[in-house]
A protein has these predicted regions:
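Transmembrane alpha-helices and adjacent helix-loop boundaries
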Residues: 1-231
């Protein structure tokens, strides 16, 4: 009973006293906002990069744009996301005071590099005969891509895009390095107030785990549904 009283006191100190649970609530809200908007930015940019890259692969066009995209992919995929976040915060967007906006841009630019390769592989996985069929119907290149190729590619890559969302959710845990309140930072602030590391950090880990498990379950259900639709 003594140990249960001790645990109750620790839970009270960490979450109830001075409404400390609000650090977790606010942090979780910011984490979700950053992840959603960063993924949206990543998908838009990633699709544009993928279309440039596949256009170059298919017909050799857009050589300069393709070169820029290749350099972008090499830099983003070859450097740690934390360094990218710090460079964007301290150098590129040093005058921007909205830290959530900075984080969205940093994680969105990072995500775009991975989304681009997912989309590109999805487009390339669509049978070349589909492309030729579109052209034979009198559609030009961009119409064929928009009406025939991309709708099929999206179906192929949806699970991979959702997995990218899950990866990005976990990556945002470094947002605290720019002094921003995210879920991880919220737990760390409680730790610094109570000098108790175990309970707040385990709570943060459990929240991430529950969200990731729910999203992973959604991905599995989607994959099963897509497979059953193909039969």
């Amino acid at each position: 009973s003594g140990s249960s009283i001790g645990i109750k006191e620790k839970l009270y100190d960490n979450f109830v006293k001075d409404n400390r649970y609000m650090y977790i609530v606010k942090g979780l809200g910011n984490t979700i906002v950053i992840t959603i908007f960063a993924v949206m930015l990543g998908i838009v940019l990633g699709f544009l990069i993928a279309i440039v890259r596949t256009s170059h692969d298919r017909n050799g066009g857009l050589a300069i744009l393709n070169g820029i995209c290749k350099a972008y992919l090499t830099i983003i995929r070859g450097t740690p996301v934390m360094i990218q976040l710090l460079i964007i915060y301290y150098v590129v967007l040093a005058s921007v005071t909205n830290k959530i906006l900075v984080a969205v841009i940093a994680f969105g630019l990072n995500s775009a590099a991975y989304v681009a390769e997912i989309v590109r592989s999805g487009i390339m996985s669509v049978d070349i005969g589909q492309f030729e069929a579109g052209r034979s119907l009198g559609l030009n290149y961009s119409q064929t891509m928009k009406l025939v190729i991309i709708p099929q590619a999206v179906k192929n890559i949806l699970p991979a895009l959702l997995n990218e969302f899950i990866s990005l959710l976990k990556e945002t845990s470094i947002s605290g390095y720019i002094g921003m309140m995210d879920l991880t930072k919220g737990g760390d602030i409680i730790r610094s107030n109570t000098y108790e590391a175990f309970i707040p950090l385990i709570a943060v880990a459990l929240i991430y785990l529950v969200i990731v498990m729910l999203l992973s379950h959604g991905v599995s259900k989607l994959e099963r549904r897509l497979r059953s639709n193909e039969r």
